[in-house]
Amino acid sequence: MAATAAAAAAAPPADPPDSSPAASSPPRPSPEELVARAVAPVKPAFLRPPLSATPPKDEGKANGGGAVVAEKKSKRQLKRERKQEQKSSSHLCIEVGKSGNVSSCKYGDSCRFSHDIDAYLAQKPADLEGTCPFTNLDQLCPYGLTCRFLGTHKDIHAASGNLSEKHEINALNKDIQKLLWKNKYKFPKASAQIKLLGLKEVIKSKPDAANDDKKVNHDNLDGNDDENKEPLCNPPVNAECDSTLCEELDRSEGEPLIDNSIPCVEPRPTKKSKVESDEIDKHGAGTLNTNTESEDPNLSNGLEPSNNSSSCRTDLITTPHLREKKIIDFREKLYLAPLTTVGNLPFRRLCKTLGADITCGEMAMCTNLLQGQASEWALLRRHSSEDLFGVQICGAYPDTVARTVELVDNECSVDFIDINMGCPIDIVVNKGAGSSLLTKPMRIKSIVQAASTVTEKPLTVKVRTAFFEGRNRADSIVSDIYDWGASAITVHGRSRQQRYSKLADWDYIYQCAQKAPDQLHVVGNGDVFSFTDWNKHVSGCSKISTSMIARGALIKPWIFTEVKEQRHWDITSGERFNILKDFVSFGLEHWGSDSKGVETTRYFLLEWLSYTCRYIPVGLLDVIPQRLNWRPPSYCGRDDLETLMISDSAADWIRISEMLLGKVPEGFTFTPKHKSNAYDRAENG
């Protein structure tokens, strides 16, 4: 022991361990290893230490609000505050604001809003930088004194009759809304077709709608009628079913609330109606005598009679054959997917400027449209630049969907109507709509047959691979859906249960396309994030007409330019900022240039920025193109603006919005509606 200690003491001292960063840190994985682990291979020069994992207390707040939780107010308090706020000087009457003349309001002293112009101008916030979007269009601003760009107006006291020209269509007519509120809008085609298919229509349009013309045109549109308490339409039920099966309706969506103790009976057509349905499948036309006088649908709905000699007759319903319908060629066209919340009209208009060919509105619920809800009808708005435009609807029952299709066909200008049978969110699935229809193929058949025969416009269907993971069902309906009446089908390569936890299954999409008839357009959907992805998926199967672009367009809307020019665009922060400017300009033109319109534009801009922050510039990557499932490391941009744009902090998104729309109101907070940062977990609906 002593000898060992002496030898150790005599030995020279060991070199101290190297404490340099290069020696202490593990070797950096290669780009190939990072890609295999679904980590974005950012160049080492742009990497930086990760920030604190705990978000600051003022995350998503403009002015770093305190820790005190505000007490929740009752509905009575909120209503009282709304009334007081309406009478405040900050809420100037719309008509007075347009013309700058107090006497222009027809309600006079009984108006609910303020008529004090001097008080309004005294408390009005300072004008925003820039010019009024309507001035740039050489048009008079419809917001007059309330515009946040008032100083740039050429004539602030112009007559309201010379206001800006409308570039948007499909607005809800007030007379039509009144008929929908009273459940007096007639659906002759849908009612006849539902009866022809052997499905029972319990609630029908109220009679004597034609005699209510004066009432429709002169009554106030408050919707507080006794008739509005009744449901618009009931689900189709078998004539042999108990009539108490569907007594109650959910007021929020109008769908049936069936007692779980009673088994739900799928509607089955009678033998006679089955023969008639087969005749429709073979010949594309059906005739039904209802022993009622023929009438103009406009006249029956209390409107001006139509001059069209080919108006619909309720005693003779002739359903158009598929060959007689307008044909839309989807082949190799750039299709912007319908996107909830962020797929609004200004965003679609922006994508059109960047190269999109086909656009589709946000998903609208059938029952809400039939009830005349203005917020739902706003989803059907179309801009004049959208030359190939469709609307997407979602419903659970044949009669509801058929009525909605007939309503849209009569009142809106669209090129095609899409039925969403792939929506995965719970509030839709729990009502029997969306992806839950994949478990009911006979219901799908009834919906498509009923809807396709009430319109001459092409009908398309959007589905997922399946409802449950590993139980693919889409291929079982692709071969028949054309015979039922659909012109195209979009297959999203994920199941409802899977959501975004894995990459889209394009092999299964190709399998579905191989089973489709030649006349049916098959559109693929899932994980298209570059022009190479689009080329690969469209050329991977000759029966794939095109590929729908969804999240890829949200993260980088210039993907349409990349596909058309066949290049990876290393876009600069300045070019991206100009795109944001265009969106803000389109938003102010759509939602308004007053204070309310500015804040609405800000909200949708922030929702969109929660997606664009996922984009990694091409010049920062060792491997291109970027993939949707790549998780970005902590990195910085090539300049301060690019670094700000790649931040996933809501406070930084608010800072960007302030660069475009001025300071946010005091106490402003923002929380994204969608979890856009879902990379490998089933979070994002």
UniProtKB/Swiss-Prot annotation:
Keywords (alphabetical) are:
Flavoprotein, FMN, Metal-binding, mRNA processing, NAD, NADP, Oxidoreductase, Repeat, tRNA processing, Zinc, Zinc-finger
Q: Name one Pfam family in it.
A: Dus
A GO term for molecular function: zinc ion binding
From the UniProt record, list the reaction(s) this protein catalyses. Answer: 5,6-dihydrouridine(47) in tRNA + NAD(+) = uridine(47) in tRNA + NADH + H(+); 5,6-dihydrouridine(47) in tRNA + NADP(+) = uridine(47) in tRNA + NADPH + H(+); a 5,6-dihydrouridine in mRNA + NAD(+) = a uridine in mRNA + NADH + H(+); a 5,6-dihydrouridine in mRNA + NADP(+) = a uridine in mRNA + NADPH + H(+)
From start to end residue, where is composition biased (Pro residues)? 13-29
InterPro entries for this protein: Aldolase_TIM, DUS-like_FMN-bd, tRNA_hU_synthase_CS, Znf_CCCH
Q: For bias kind Polar residues, which ranges apply?
A: 287-314
* Annotated GO biological process: mRNA processing
* Segments of this protein annotated with the region Disordered: 1-91, 209-234, 257-314
> Zinc finger (C3H1-type) locations?
87-118
Q: What is its EC number?
A: 1.3.1.89, 1.3.1.-
Q: So what family is this one in?
A: Belongs to the Dus family. Dus3 subfamily.
Q: What is the protein name for this chain?
A: tRNA-dihydrouridine(47) synthase [NAD(P)(+)]-like
